[in-house]
Design a protein with these regions (language model features):
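Short, flexible loop segments at the rims of nucleotide/cofactor-binding pockets, characterized by
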Residues: 91-97, 143, 160-165, 202-204, ...
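Non-catalytic C-terminal accessory region of glycerolipid acyltransferases
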Residues: 38, 106-111, 134-135, 169-290
Length: 290
């Protein structure tokens, strides 16, 4: 019964993403505004995170970020649908985008050098990844969905352009890819629990931060780059950058990476996925997200 209902919803989803892009954006903003008016836990998480991360902003400035973030969240259904259901040709024809720094990635790929490509959780991360994968050979890491049926939809959608997807809990797959000269997308900016993490500052607050990246880089001998994404009006911008983080220890490396992600978020704070409980393991999910 659940799968039957889900199949109907997926069919409806595939239909609405056939709408012209301008109409999608209009309906997305309408959905976002309705979400903004509603009382739900994701709105609460977003509001709490923005308050924690921008203590120096006045309440009106934080409110604007929060409101715009929730309204933009309404577009996720369309951006993700485009990423999972559209063809490469249709995306190239209908979605304005620009990739800066692609040559940095292509340089390593031509040399058959593995690349751990860090990125942050933007609201449009599925579309970001799809567009990059249209233009370069990319592999990904994911958290499996609880629904087996939806997991198949998610995986098939991501594999439209990506060459492979690995479960984030099974590092052996993407470690092998990196050793074999592949490029793997990797987002370290969520709370995956304290057991596999270190407490490292994020916006000046202790946050459970995955400690694996430097170990993976050292073990595989791969290089690393950073992908930052944001909108300039209707054009999606993807910047491929080559930062340098301290290799002295996993903690110092991740502190540098967290600060780098912070700086990118501050440029377009309304486009970040604030709906995740980033500080649940360190500040207490029952205490601050209740």
């Amino acid at each position: 019964m659940k799968n039957a209902l889900l199949q109907i919803l997926i069919f409806f989803w595939k239909v609405i993403v056939l709408l012209p892009r301008k109409i999608q954006l209009f309906f997305g903003d309408c959905i976002g505004y309705l979400l903004f008016l509603s009382k739900n836990k994701r709105n609460r998480f977003s509001k709490v995170n923005i308050k924690l991360c921008f203590p120096n902003l006045d309440s009106n400035s934080r409110y604007r970020i929060y409101k715009n973030n929730i309204i933009l969240f309404g577009r996720v259904i369309f951006d993700t649908g485009i990423a999972w259901f559209w063809s490469d040709n249709r995306i190239n024809k209908n979605i304005p985008y620009k990739i800066n720094g692609l040559h940095l990635l292509q340089r390593y790929q031509k040399l058959n050098k593995g690349v751990l490509l860090f990125f942050k959780h933007s609201l449009h991360l599925e579309l970001d990844s799809r567009i990059l994968a249209i233009n370069a050979e990319i592999y990904g890491v994911e958290r499996k969905h609880n629904s087996t049926y939806f997991e198949s939809i998610q995986k098939n959608g991501r594999l439209k352009s990506m060459k492979g997807i690995a479960d984030r809990n099974r590092t052996i797959s993407f470690v092998r890819w990196l050793k074999n000269g592949k490029t793997v997308l990797y987002a370290p900016d969520q709370d995956y629990g304290i057991k596999k993490s270190d407490q490292i500052d994020f916006f000046g607050l202790p946050a459970a931060t995955i400690s694996a990246p430097l170990k993976i880089i050292t073990k595989t001998g791969c290089n690393y780059l950073f992908m930052n994404t944001y909108y300039e009006e209707s054009c999606l911008i993807i910047d491929i950058e080559e930062p340098k983080f301290s290799p002295a220890s996993s903690t110092m490396f991740m502190q540098d990476l967290n600060k780098y992600i912070e700086d990118k978020i501050k440029l377009n704070p309304e486009e970040y996925l604030w709906q995740h409980r980033r500080f649940k393991s360190t500040l207490g999910k029952e205490k601050i997200y209740k």
